[in-house]
UniProtKB/Swiss-Prot annotation:
Positions of the J domain: 4-68
Annotated source species: Corynebacterium glutamicum (strain ATCC 13032 / DSM 20300 / JCM 1318 / BCRC 11384 / CCUG 27702 / LMG 3730 / NBRC 12168 / NCIMB 10025 / NRRL B-2784 / 534)
An example Gene Ontology biological process: protein refolding
Annotated Gene Ontology cellular component terms: cytoplasm
Assembly behavior: Homodimer.
Protein name: Chaperone protein DnaJ 1
UniProt-recorded Gene Ontology molecular function terms: ATP binding; heat shock protein binding; unfolded protein binding; zinc ion binding
Keyword terms, alphabetized: Chaperone, Cytoplasm, DNA replication, Metal-binding, Repeat, Stress response, Zinc, Zinc-finger
Zinc finger map (CR-type): 134-216
Statement: the UniProt record of this protein carries the keyword Repeat: yes
Amino acid sequence: MARDYYGILGVDRNATESEIKKAYRKLARKYHPDVNPGEEAAEKFREASVAHEVLTDPDKRRIVDMGGDPMEQGGGAGAGGFGGGFGGSGGLGDIFDAFFGGGAGGSRGPRSRVQPGSDTLWRTSITLEEAYKGAKKDLTLDTAVLCTKCHGSGSASDKKPVTCGTCNGAGEIQEVQRSFLGNVMTSRPCHTCDGTGEIIPDPCTECAGDGRVRARRDIVANIPAGIQSGMRIRMAGQGEVGAGGGPAGDLYIEVMVRPHAIFTRDGDDLHASIKVPMFDAALGTELDVESLTGEEVKITIPAGTQPNDVITLDGEGMPKLRAEGHGNLMAHVDLFVPTDLDDRTRELLEEIRNHRSDNASVHREGGEESGFFDKLRNKFRK
């Protein structure tokens, strides 16, 4: 005869999953072996656990509503519940019995209640100047921290965890399901102890027995000089605290260097465009340019400098990360041609143009040869 799982929990057949769980928790608190010792209470606790398992599983509940019992022999049995064994269906089912031992085959055992914490990734952005000098960044993290009330134990008192009555400490519920191969055993984590095989009889009211709570935490991250965009800084033990007060994971800070208005970075080198008057480019000169640090750096412009020429200033680039030395500053020449000429300047420029008119043009329309390269090219054509 099928068991009355609804009657065991004291709920009607139309009860919601929330009502079923609420009724189960009420009975579990009443009949838990640590609270109510004795064989009769232990049996009622086991009955309530199995009823909860059945009625919170949609497939099993459907079988109950159709008048069946999913926990009868061959229909599945939870450790510590009513059923047990594979039953005798013969055929391929017996072969699976031989491999799985007719009971606890494939068991992984309970997992530890104390688990290591997860790593945390935090992204932050800095200026190019901060990447050059190094910086300290104040960060506020929303993370899992150790519960200060129970210090990670999860218990509100000195009582130690007790063996879970649902799975008898196995940490998992084993079930037998029918398939075209016969009876196949499956297992899943125990819903009562969450797979740990033990429960806390008096859970901490602050963390609900988890040993950790969510909180905001302030930390200071040291950004080393020379860091590049996309690099990560590892801060050991600064991630999330694990369940049961387990060791914290690591914190990884991913750094993004914001674009600069003047300088462009390429590895350890810096690139910048400098405006050079055409007179200085022709005659050569020395100019003072401002570096990334704000200091004046002297740059030599050779005579005859052309547009887009690159002048290298050794050691004026970014510091090398965790190494000696700096990269270079690559100054790209942007030739500046004045547009508002006074009469004297215009007169001098015209004089220069007339003086160099014999070789200033590289190409002249008409049949007349325009320079040395034209003459050389025409020689090869003959």
